[in-house]
Amino acid sequence: MTVSEFFEALASNEDFIFAVAHTNSFKKNVKLCYKQNLDLNELYQVISSLAKLETLPSKNHVHSLTGYGKERKGEKYMECHVAPDWLLIWVQKDDEMIFIFTNTGSHANMFGM
């Protein structure tokens, strides 16, 4: 799956229960993941499951993330693992239940380790 195919699939999926939005930094990080030969199909499957409210396997380790960004009332930052050292972070809005995907990358890239 190419970068353009990835974003086309996100935009055109009618099976999603919730709307999917992304930031410019997320788009740049997806391009970087593609250049690093990471499988964008894996990322798409995780996002697709989240947007359909499907339960991800325990290997994805979905959890809330504190201290990452400025949370506003009714929203929280969440994180899961696409692969062991490949993270996906998003803002989950409780009132609208819209996921806004913000970043991908390894633990070292994400948290300056």
Predicted segments, located by residue:
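Enriched for short, Lys/Arg-rich terminal
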Residues: M1-E14, E75-M113
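Arg/Lys-rich, positively charged N-terminal/basic patches that mediate binding to nucleic acids
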Residues: M1-S49
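Intrinsic-disorder/low-complexity peptide segments enriched for small residues
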Residues: S4-E8, N41, S48, E54, ...
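A short acidic, often aromatic-flanked loop/helix-cap motif at beta-alpha or helix-coil junctions
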Residues: K28-V30, K70, N109-M110
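A short, surface-exposed loop/turn module that caps and links secondary-structure elements
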Residues: A51-C80
